[in-house]
Amino acid sequence: MNQPQEYKVVSLRECPTPAEMQLCDTPDKAVSYWRSHIVNHPYFNPECECFAVLLLNTRRRIKGHQLVSIGTLDTLLVHPREVFRLAIMIGGVSAILLMHNHPSGDAAPSEADIKVTHDLIRAGQLIKIDVLDHIIVGQPTPDGARDFASLRELGYCS
């Protein structure tokens, strides 16, 4: 016999209205969203790799986001089940944008980053949710140089 489960609400926020949803149609806008929302999440740790998903509607406006996984200094476990779960649950999500940080500051993608991107693109194709990009965020540089990498711009998201 199944016993009743008790759940604790960790974070609750009202869904934005269409007028409040931010447009996210470039890597720069995604990184701006990362810096204003994801890094302020209570579980975000800049000393560990953290993987987040931005949930987008058909007009590329952000319906919400989810911090999917928190790893170690240089490793992260990401599974399609967790990546797409919230997108399926809330509905109205036609695409997602993958993002994670590299605590080392170097935003260059690793072989593992490229592989997980390809795996998640294939999973998204099965359920008709597009994976638009995977953006790796490094550390800001004093000279203001670009401190992130877009795997789409690098040719890995096709």
Place the predicted regions along the sequence by residue:
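Histidine/lysine/aspartate-rich catalytic loop segments that bind and position anionic ligands
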Residues: 49-89
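A generic structural signal for ordered alpha-helices
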Residues: 8, 12, 31-34, 38, ...
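Glycine-enriched loop-and-adjacent helix/strand subsegments that border the catalytic/binding cleft
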Residues: 17-54, 59-61
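Active-site-proximal loop/helix of nucleotide/amide-processing enzymes and allied scaffolds
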Residues: 1-16, 20, 73-158
